[in-house]
Structures are given as C-alpha cells and as structure tokens.
Amino acid sequence: RKALEQEVPGLAPRWQAGLLFEQDGQIDNRRQLMRALEKACVSLGVQFLEGAEVQALSRDNDSQELQQISLRTAEGEVQHHPCRRAVLCSGAWSQKLVPELPVFPVKGQMLSLQGPRKALKRVIFGPGTYLVPREDGLIVVGATSERGTGFSAGLTPDGQAQLQAGIQDLLPMAGSWPPMERWW
C-alpha cells in the first residue's frame, strides 16, 4: 500500500494494489494530432473530402468485394468513386452502411475537474471510471457506458452521479475540486 500511495497520493484506502504501466501515454491536444495525421496521409496520396457524406458502399453481387463508394459532397453533388478498400470510421452509425455489422451506440458521459497542478501524476483506471491528469491540473473523468440509450443527446443525472461515485471510489480528495466542464 505504501508504494501505491507514493505513486498516487490520496488514492482511496480500499485499494491495496495496482498495476503500473510505465509507458502509458496520452494526447492532450487531439487537434494537433489529427492535423499531423492528416498531413501524413496527404503526403501519401490520401484525399480528404470534408463535409462529404457517404451514401452507399457498393459490392459485387457474387464475390461481395467492394466496388465503389457513393457520396454526397458538401455542395450537394453526388459522386461515385471506384475502390477495392475503404476505411469505415463512422462509429455507431456504421450499421447504416453495412447493416450486417453488430454495431450499436453506447453513450458515454464525462466531466473535468480543476485540481491543483501535479495533484495527480498518473492515469488511474478503476471499475467503471478513469481519471486522466493534464499538466495544468485539469482532471478528465470518464466515462459512463450506457447501452440502450440510442443516440440520445444530453447529460443525465444518473450518468453524472455514476462519475461522482467513481471519483469518490478512486481519489476522494478530487470530489472537492470544482467541475469545469461536462459532456457526452
């Protein structure tokens, strides 16, 4: 327990052991990451069509191999692009394009707290909750995992209560830190 407290001061007393992942990392600025990824892809010949919506994936009737994608551009023009492969990254909406995929929405709610700088130095994963420290003391708390909610928008009292309970279960002192933002 003593070694655990040295790694995570203030950890709730019920935790007697933990796993340390020395190489665990995080990205604080996802926008910079995505810009760098886009730049690398473009340098390899990838074309991005921003604001375009894929309408259909057409497959060969016999082999079921992908033949083309049909999309509507941001300007409303319908285009057909022959291809043998496509990256499907539409998340919970993927089933609209490939109905046989067993994909469904799972709602996640999160919040952030403003803690003292360096109050938490490591990511903490607990049952149903995790705490991610940022350099400025901000702590990202996540996330609920709510099946059966469909694509419902908004925060729920139950989801927010679950996050608060997770904070108390992992790092009780964080329960007194002011909330900064809540999202789903």
Labelled PLM ranges:
Residues 1-44, 49-50, 56-65:
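Flavin (FAD/FMN) cofactor-binding and adjacent substrate-gating region
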Residues 15, 65, 77, 106-107, ...:
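A generic structural signal for well-ordered coil/turn residues at beta-strand boundaries
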Residues 22, 70-74, 114:
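A generic structural motif
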Residues 34, 93-96, 147:
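Glycine-rich nucleotide phosphate-binding loop and flanking beta-alpha elements
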Residues 55-81:
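Conserved beta-strand-loop-beta-strand element in the redox core of flavoprotein oxidoreductases
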Residues 63, 68, 85, 110, ...:
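Structural motif
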Residues 76-125, 153-159, 173-175:
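Central helical "cap/lid" subdomain
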Residues 118-184:
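Active-site lid/adjacent beta-loop-alpha segment flanking the redox-cofactor pocket in flavoenzymes
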